[in-house]
């Protein structure tokens, strides 16, 4: 079976491990987008440390879970989002105001919707985490 989205597989593995109460999860293959997405999640405290393991193939990532994650997911296709429309997307995707983050890929890098609003940049929507 072919993989349609490496990021979707990674976030699905994290969700499943979190639901079953695991303390860590192995993600393979890895990509730069997954690493940046995990950095945003780590910055907001949804996951603990994560380590990239180079196996001379596609690489692996070991993520330490801390039990704070409720759900994370990918939005496919990656819709273009203007700064004014971010509020509509947060209302649709997140369970409540001031709770969780919509993660965007912008010209200034991968960041959450609040940082994108501060930097006044728009981009494509990658996913959400809460």
Swiss-Prot record:
PROSITE patterns: RIBOSOMAL_S8 (PS00053). The keyword Cell membrane does not apply. Disulfide bonds: none annotated. Keywords: Ribonucleoprotein, Ribosomal protein. One of its GO terms (molecular function) is structural constituent of ribosome. One of its GO terms (biological process) is translation. Gene3D superfamilies: 3.30.1370.30, 3.30.1490.10. GO terms for cellular component: ribonucleoprotein complex; ribosome. It holds the Pfam family Ribosomal_S8. Belongs to the universal ribosomal protein uS8 family. This is Small ribosomal subunit protein uS8. The lineage of its organism: Eukaryota, Fungi, Dikarya, Ascomycota, Saccharomycotina.
């Amino acid at each position: 079976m072919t993989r349609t989205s490496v990021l979707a597989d990674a976030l699905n593995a994290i969700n499943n491990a979190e639901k079953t109460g695991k303390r860590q999860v192995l993600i393979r293959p890895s990509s730069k987008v997954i690493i940046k997405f995990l950095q945003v999640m780590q910055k907001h405290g949804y996951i603990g440390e994560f380590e990239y393991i180079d196996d001379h193939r596609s690489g692996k990532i070991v993520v330490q879970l801390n039990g704070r994650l409720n759900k994370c997911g990918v939005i496919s296709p990656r819709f273009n989002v203007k700064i004014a429309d971010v509020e509509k997307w947060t209302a649709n995707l997140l369970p409540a105001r001031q709770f969780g983050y919509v993660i965007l890929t912008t010209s200034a890098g991968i960041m959450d919707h609040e940082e994108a609003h501060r930097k006044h940049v728009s981009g494509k929507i990658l996913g959400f985490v809460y």
